[in-house]
Amino acid sequence: MDNLANQGVIVLAAGGTGGHLFPAEALAHELRARGWDVHLATDARAQRFVGAFAQDHVHVIRSATIAGRNPVALLKTFWSLWQGNLDSRKLFRRLKPKLVVGFGGYPTLPPLYAASNMGIPTLIHEQNAVMGRANKGLAGRVKAIAGGFLPENSGAYAAKTVITGNPVRSPVLVAAATPYTPAGKDDRFRLLVFGGSQGAQFFSQAIPAAVALLPEHERARLLITQQARKEDEASARQAYEKLGVPADVAPFFNDMPARMADAHFVIARSGASTVSEITVIGRPAMLVPFPHALDHDQAANAAALAAAGGAEVVRQADLSPQRLAEMLQSAMNEPERLEQQAKAAKSVGKPDAARLLADLAEAIASGKTVQEFKEGNRP
């Protein structure tokens, strides 16, 4: 523990979903290896995702999501954010962090505003190809911006933006060592259906309906792993049982990276963490962006991977059970195409993103500017 005292404290602030917390966890692992004492500021939703942090290093900060125009609701929201600001100031006075890093989501607003007002260096990481609302609100205040899928050298804050990629957790890096082996035309075909950390109700209905339309000899090849919301779990499992298709259905899989490495084909939403893990592990995918995302960030993430040849992108509105069955059957019978797609996906993966982000974090914590960091990292 002596080296922790030498380096000091860094606080990571992240909204309480896997998309925000998984990259924070990956950065925490890298920073700890460099001798930093890493704490997490988050909201009450985060409990199932924070196993990588010691309990006394997880701090729940009061917050709320800004939504709608109801004046009473807005007043309550801003009151919660103000209380979160007080929570954050109290925490920072005790921990004396050398840096606060935000990973998006409204729960990051109180810690990042408090830190910038207290003169603590700040950095935000934007996982998506389009900046989210919380990060947009912070971009003008922070010392540096790190990007996962943000376009290089674009936007009003290009001068203080560094493209690091999205940090992925250690199990993803382990899974990335498993090469992609296409299924032969008579082999079992392992399908992974993944709706992101919060699940996807659409997949729980559409995938079983599509599988039911496949010819019997194609159904007999399938082995399915599907993440489903708790309220959809039983119905999805029963649908596969009626079809005689082996399926492992659950709301959450702790070993998702290993399951992705084992898959021949992935059908998924296109949140930044999901797309990053697909590219680092290198698996062919059909991406169905969440259609109601306020900033259309999932569509932009999916487009970035599709442009590299690493995925097919289909709008949910266009994905009838019939079309889904046709696309699934095509994937099952074109192993060469899937192998090329897997190679293309892996070619754009950034397995060293955690190292790059940690380098930037240490530079900002030491008082360097982004310009100085960029000059020091030129080949």
Curated annotation (Swiss-Prot):
In terms of SUPFAM superfamilies, this protein maps to: UDP-Glycosyltransferase/glycogen phosphorylase
Its recorded reaction(s) are: di-trans,octa-cis-undecaprenyl diphospho-N-acetyl-alpha-D-muramoyl-L-alanyl-D-glutamyl-meso-2,6-diaminopimeloyl-D-alanyl-D-alanine + UDP-N-acetyl-alpha-D-glucosamine = di-trans,octa-cis-undecaprenyl diphospho-[N-acetyl-alpha-D-glucosaminyl-(1->4)]-N-acetyl-alpha-D-muramoyl-L-alanyl-D-glutamyl-meso-2,6-diaminopimeloyl-D-alanyl-D-alanine + UDP + H(+)
Cellular compartments annotated = Cell inner membrane
Q: One GO cellular component from the entry? A: plasma membrane
GO molecular function terms noted in the UniProt entry: UDP-N-acetyl-D-glucosamine:N-acetylmuramoyl-L-alanyl-D-glutamyl-meso-2,6-diaminopimelyl-D-alanyl-D-alanine-diphosphoundecaprenol 4-beta-N-acetylglucosaminlytransferase activity; undecaprenyldiphospho-muramoylpentapeptide beta-N-acetylglucosaminyltransferase activity
EC code: 2.4.1.227
User: Where would you say this protein principally sits, based on its record?
Assistant: membrane
Recite the UniProt keywords alphabetically.
Answer: Cell cycle, Cell division, Cell inner membrane, Cell membrane, Cell shape, Cell wall biogenesis/degradation, Glycosyltransferase, Membrane, Peptidoglycan synthesis, Transferase
Disulfide bridge map: none
- Give me the residues that bind UDP-N-acetyl-alpha-D-glucosamine, please: T17, G18, G19, N128, R169, S197, Q298
What pathway does this protein act in?
Cell wall biogenesis; peptidoglycan biosynthesis
Topological type in the membrane: Peripheral membrane protein
User: Per its UniProt record, what Pfam families does this chain match?
Assistant: Glyco_tran_28_C, Glyco_transf_28
So which domain of life are we looking at? Bacteria
GO biological process: one example: regulation of cell shape
HAMAP family given in the database record:
MurG
Briefly state the protein's biological role. Cell wall formation. Catalyzes the transfer of a GlcNAc subunit on undecaprenyl-pyrophosphoryl-MurNAc-pentapeptide (lipid intermediate I) to form undecaprenyl-pyrophosphoryl-MurNAc-(pentapeptide)GlcNAc (lipid intermediate II).
| Family, as annotated | Belongs to the glycosyltransferase 28 family. MurG subfamily.
Q: What is this protein called?
A: UDP-N-acetylglucosamine--N-acetylmuramyl-(pentapeptide) pyrophosphoryl-undecaprenol N-acetylglucosamine transferase
The organism is: Brucella abortus (strain 2308)
Q: Species lineage, top-down?
A: Bacteria, Pseudomonadati, Pseudomonadota, Alphaproteobacteria, Hyphomicrobiales
